[in-house]
């Protein structure tokens, strides 16, 4: 395996577990994801896809470019960056590229990455959370009858991203839920991942009218300076939801 180097703001999103790295590579193969390859300080770029993985020997095989001179520069490079940019960003680097002959033609071979970045972009992709067994966010708020005391407001999540969460709240709204209000010590128990301890800030409140049903609100919260540990938990849960969404879409196709 090759150990990759990442920039400082990507460190909290690094996947170290070999089984997770292998699973991510297999997902990229399964969904025929396009991978951008850059080298020569970004001067050379091409798009490829992963052909196969040999977990036993720790080898990953990718399609090679058609230009021989370009391929020579690629094979001579000692720092090549591989990025899947759409949806959840996947990134890793390799210092050793080899040209090989497979039964279907030429390919490039790299070592299975020891580390890779898996990053959900903040500005894209809110993933719906389970409806049958909703994920609950517990928010400490001032007690209505005794503001000096706190009570726990439990809200069901409807979606989540790396930037924040969406919750569904029945009318009437708790008076503490106003735009811009921040709450410390909020806990979300993400299934199969763990429990967060976050500061959440009310970002938006949208009234939802459904025929013959009481008025409800979608209350959106953003995370306020989450710790690396909390961001890691959120990122892993988002990745689980993305895989479930992809599997569902392919099953319905």
Swiss-Prot record:
- Write out the similarity annotation: Belongs to the YcgR family.
Gene Ontology terms, MF aspect = cyclic-di-GMP binding
Record keywords: Bacterial flagellum, c-di-GMP, Nucleotide-binding
Q: What is the lineage of its organism?
A: Bacteria, Pseudomonadati, Pseudomonadota, Betaproteobacteria, Nitrosomonadales
Q: Where in the cell is it found?
A: Bacterial flagellum basal body
Which Pfam families does this entry report, sorted A to Z?
PilZ (PF07238), PilZN (PF07317)
Q: What is the predominant subcellular site recorded for this chain?
A: other
Signal peptide residues are none
Instruction: Tell me one GO biological process term.
Output: bacterial-type flagellum-dependent cell motility
Its job: Acts as a flagellar brake, regulating swimming and swarming in a bis-(3'-5') cyclic diguanylic acid (c-di-GMP)-dependent manner. Binds 1 c-di-GMP dimer per subunit. Increasing levels of c-di-GMP lead to decreased motility.
Cysteine disulfide links: none
Question: What is the originating organism of this protein?
Answer: Methylotenera mobilis (strain JLW8 / ATCC BAA-1282 / DSM 17540)
Domain PilZ, which positions?
120-239
HAMAP family assigned: YcgR
Cellular component aspect of the GO annotation = bacterial-type flagellum basal body
Self-association state and partner proteins as the record states: Monomer. Interacts with the flagellar basal bodies.
InterPro entries xrefs: PilZ_domain, Split_barrel_FMN-bd, T3SS_YcgR, T3SS_YcgR_PilZN
Question: What protein does this entry describe?
Answer: Flagellar brake protein YcgR
């Amino acid at each position: 395996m090759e150990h990759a180097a990442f920039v400082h703001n990507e460190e909290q999103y690094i996947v170290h577990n070999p089984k997770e790295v292998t699973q991510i590579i297999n997902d990229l193969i399964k969904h025929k994801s396009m991978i951008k390859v850059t080298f020569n300080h970004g001067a050379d770029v091409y798009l490829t896809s992963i052909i196969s993985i040999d977990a036993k020997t720790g080898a990953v095989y990718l399609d090679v470019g058609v230009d021989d001179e370009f391929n020579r520069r690629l094979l001579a490079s000692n720092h090549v960056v591989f990025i899947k940019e759409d949806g959840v960003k996947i990134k890793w680097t390799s210092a050793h590229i080899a040209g090989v002959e497979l039964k279907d033609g030429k390919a490039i071979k790299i070592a299975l990455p020891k580390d890779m970045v898996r990053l959900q972009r903040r500005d894209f992709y809110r993933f719906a959370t389970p409806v049958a067994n909703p994920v609950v966010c517990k928010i400490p708020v001032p007690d209505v009858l005794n503001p000096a005391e706190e009570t726990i407001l439990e809200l069901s999540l409807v979606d989540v991203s790396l930037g924040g969460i969406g919750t569904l709240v029945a009318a009437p709204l708790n008076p503490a839920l106003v735009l811009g209000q921040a709450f410390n010590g909020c806990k979300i128990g993400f299934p199969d991942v763990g429990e967060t301890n976050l500061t959440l800030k009310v970002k938006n409140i949208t009234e939802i009218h459904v025929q013959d049903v009481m008025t409800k609100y979608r209350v959106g919260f953003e995370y306020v300076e989450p710790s690396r540990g909390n961001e890691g938990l959120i990122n892993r849960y988002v990745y689980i939801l993305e895989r479930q969404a992809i599997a569902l879409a392919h099953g319905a196709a």
